[in-house]
Amino acid sequence: MKTVGHRLGLPELLILIGSCSFIFVLWLSAYFEPDIRWLHFFQAWMYFSAIWLSAHRSRWGYLIGLSAAGLWDYINIFVTTFFRSGLHWLFAWVSTGQLKHVDQIIAVPAWIGNFLVVAGSVWAYARLPEKRRGDLGRLALAFVLTTGFFAASVAVCQRRYLPLFRGIIHPHRPW
């Protein structure tokens, strides 16, 4: 694995900002709902890995970031109503001035943070000087491993969320 220094370019900065935003939302969510703390602890490690590897300009960091963050945003558009509900309560707060359901509103910055990770990962990979024939296989492996790690974390820490994985295979727009 060849690395090129520690200087962050704009794509790596997007990965860093998006990941840190999402990790903060994971922490905040765990504050509101203590029984998901362990799940969010393990989930955050995928983002720490993406940050560290991306800061070292490793394609694995970009692939992990794309896989983990892409899956989270996909789930929240096609499987759950969490993001939609967050938007609803955010707009209600803006229009009425009454803050309600912060536990739902945090889905919006979480989704945006993950989108930044996806955008930064795609951009960083696109500017790599050499693309390898095996990179598509590496992306598939990163997706399988991050999804498997997430599924194992859910199975151990919060079994009630396991049906999300069925929804990944049979997506719909729950709006």
Q: Language-model features: where?
A:
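C-terminal TM-helix exit segments that contain a strictly Trp-centered aromatic cap at the helix terminus
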Residues: L71-G86, F149-L162
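Short aromatic-rich membrane-water interface segments that cap or initiate transmembrane helices
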Residues: V94-P109, P174-W175
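Hydrophobic cores of alpha-helical transmembrane segments in multi-pass inner/ER membrane proteins
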Residues: W45-S54, I106-W123
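Interfacial segments of alpha-helical transmembrane regions
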Residues: E12-I17, H56-G70, G137-V144
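Membrane-interface helix-boundary motifs at transmembrane edges
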Residues: K2-L8, W52-L63, A126-R138
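C-terminal membrane-adjacent module
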Residues: V118-W175
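Alpha-helical transmembrane segments
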Residues: L8-V25, F143-F150
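Hydrophobic, membrane-inserted alpha-helices
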Residues: C20-L26, Q43-I51
